[in-house]
């Protein structure tokens, strides 16, 4: 008789830590989707004069807990607003969400966590620190997509907390 051993690991346990080396910015957008990040970059570049500074990062590079902790210390801790778009819900980046939420609570950073797959996910709403009305507006903008919608996000309204 043969015994088969199976090893169960989370995504973060199979990754190698990465330091993105990004400096702080007023706004930070994190997503697993390169098209999301490209749209935000394009929108920001069109109207960069007068806009807050912006950093973009693909969450693929932030799977390992050490990568998350380093990014929080070096980049996110200096942000005024953070937008995270997740495909698949909390379980796909749970450690990161918990750490970023804790940072946002401690430093008063406006945090919006949105689904990137077009589905409602009330669990993600619980990680956001901004008013529900602002969160709904951001969901509509990001679901619309394109650089114009992303430009509207990078032009935050002070009354909205971003």
Name each region found by the language model:
Residues 6-44:
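N-terminal basic/disordered segments at the start of proteins
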Residues 29-35, 60, 85-88, 116:
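Structural motif
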Residues 81-100:
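Cofactor-cradling patches in redox/metallo enzymes
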Residues 153-162:
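Single conserved hydrophobic/aromatic residue that forms the stacking wall/gate
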Residues 97-140:
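Hydrophobic or amphipathic alpha-helical targeting/insertion segments
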């Amino acid at each position: 008789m043969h015994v088969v051993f199976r090893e169960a690991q989370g995504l973060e346990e199979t990754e190698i830590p990465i330091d993105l080396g990004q400096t702080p910015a007023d706004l930070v957008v994190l997503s697993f989707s390169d098209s999301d990040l490209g749209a935000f970059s394009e929108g920001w570049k069109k109207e960069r004069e007068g806009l807050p500074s912006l950093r973009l990062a693909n969450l693929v590079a932030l799977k390992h807990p050490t990568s998350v902790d380093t990014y929080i210390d070096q980049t996110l801790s200096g942000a005024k607003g953070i937008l995270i778009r997740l495909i698949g819900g909390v379980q796909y980046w749970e450690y990161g969400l918990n750490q970023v939420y804790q940072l946002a609570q401690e430093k008063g950073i406006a945090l919006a966590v949105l689904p990137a797959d077009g589905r409602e996910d009330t669990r993600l709403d619980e990680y956001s620190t901004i008013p529900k009305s602002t969160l709904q507006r951001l969901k509509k903008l990001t679901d619309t997509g394109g650089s114009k919608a992303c430009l509207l996000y990078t032009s935050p309204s002070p009354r909205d907390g971003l």
